Every structure is written in C-alpha cells, then in structure tokens.
Amino acid sequence: MSYLLRKPQSHEVSNGVKLVHEVTTSNSDLTYVEFKVLDLASGSSYTEELKKQEICIVAVTGKITVTDHESTFENIGTRESVFERKPTDSVYISNDRAFEITAVSDARVALCYSPSEKQLPTKLIKAEDNGIEHRGQFSNKRTVHNILPDSDPSANSLLVVEVYTDSGNWSSYPPHKHDQDNLPEESFLEETYYHELDPGQGFVFQRVYTDDRSIDETMTVENENVVIVPAGYHPVGVPDGYTSYYLNVMAGPTRKWKFYNDPAHEWILER
C-alpha cells in the first residue's frame, strides 16, 4: 500500500467516540496540515485543547453541538449522508482555545488543523454560506462547496472545501499542483483528501506525482480512505457508475490557493 494512502480505522478514544483517521505531522510527511475523522455516538462528547493550531470542525454527517466555552453552536449539521449533496455546517476555532463536540445524533466529524499564532474569532460557518461552484467541462466536471476559501479571512492558514465528481469524470484535472512558494505564480499548500464513494463498494484512482518523479504514486482509493499530498500533481478519476465525494484540507506558509497546471496536459483546457 502506498505511504500516501490511509485506510480507515476504528479505535475507541473515549466512551462513544471512535477515531477513524488521524494524519499528523509526526506520522506523515506533512508540516502544515493535520486531519482527523471521528465517529460520535448520540450523546457522546469529544474535547480537545488547541495550542498553536487553528481548527475547522466539519459536521460531515449527523448533528452536533460545538462550544469553545465562550460561543456555543447547537444542533448543527444538515445531512445524514454526504451524497445528499447539500452543504453542511462547520465551526472555525482559533489557536489556544479548548473546544467540546457533543453528538446530538450519531455523527461523523472531520477535524481540520493548521498552524496558527494570531487568535481570530470563533465562527459558525453556516451551510447556506458555503459558496457553490460548478467547475470544468466535458469529462472534467465537478461541484464544489467552499467552506473556508482563501477569499474568506476567517482563518490564518486553513483552506477547506468539499468536492463532488460524477460518474466517469475527472477532478483536480488537468493535473495541477501547489508545491512552490512562488507567488503570484504558485503557492505552497499541502493537502489531504478524505474520500467517500456512492455506492460504498466503489473506488477512484488518484495519482500523486512531481515533475522529477521523486513522488509518483498511483492509488486505488476506496470508501473512507485518506490520501496525503505533501507535494505534486494529484488528479482523481471516477469510474463509471459511481459518484465521488472528497473533503480537502490545505495549508501552507501563505493562505492563498494558486495552482500550476502540468504543462503536458494543459492543452485540455484549450479545447
């Protein structure tokens, strides 16, 4: 199995709370992005104290209440399945704060972390405030829900987005990268992909590769897998009959998403 691919686990961290994924700077090649997925049984709670990190808590499915002990957001979350294809609620919390998540129903929650030193206000990112985009043409069409885009100044370094790609289409395509701190041409952003498939027995293909091929990994990615992108191009292909969902987390030294297309494939945009 590729070192960039993570399969789901089911490790109980407290009563009613299971850890599905944990990507950290200690167990990966990432420096800026950390990522967790938790399953919470109805009525259970998860607490954590942030140090020099900010977090975006995404209510992937189910309903939750989130508090940082100053602000409380009750009964947030909009869907039982990501394939309802509607935006969900999220909460941004800045560094040096503690938070608690309580499950109002059975819930899956994504915790998206990046470094932060400047404290910003806690914020509820309502589902209706997610910007929705339809990108691409031909067989490269996808729908994007922008949770924390770079146009929103609510965070110091985090960028968070959900993407839906229909059967037979490609996403993050033509292949693009953002691994050079060379603005305005390109920004350096690490990235994680949390994947789900409909139907659940499906898979997608994802390739992560650099120009010099020092990274060149092609992966069969199944439901609830995570792909780590420390650098390089990272396209996703969705086979016929299946729909792809993924949650992206990005962060780097500058909070700007400026990508560079692989010159070998940029002609695709000129059709």
Curated annotation (Swiss-Prot):
- In which domain of life is the source organism classified? Bacteria
- Could you tell me which SUPFAM superfamilies the record lists for this protein? RmlC-like cupins
Q: Identify the EC number(s).
A: 5.3.1.30
> Cross-referenced InterPro entries, in alphabetical order?
Deoxy-glucuronate_isom_IolB, IolB_Bacilli, KduI/IolB_isomerase, RmlC-like_jellyroll, RmlC_Cupin_sf
Report TM segments: none
> Which cysteine pairs are covalently linked by disulfides here?
none
* First-tier enzyme category under EC: isomerase
Which Pfam families has this protein been placed in?
KduI
Give the family per the record.
Belongs to the isomerase IolB family.
Spell out the PANTHER family in the cross-references: 5-DEOXY-GLUCURONATE ISOMERASE
| Descriptive protein name | 5-deoxy-glucuronate isomerase
Q: Which organism is it from?
A: Bacillus subtilis subsp. natto
Gene this chain is encoded by: iolB
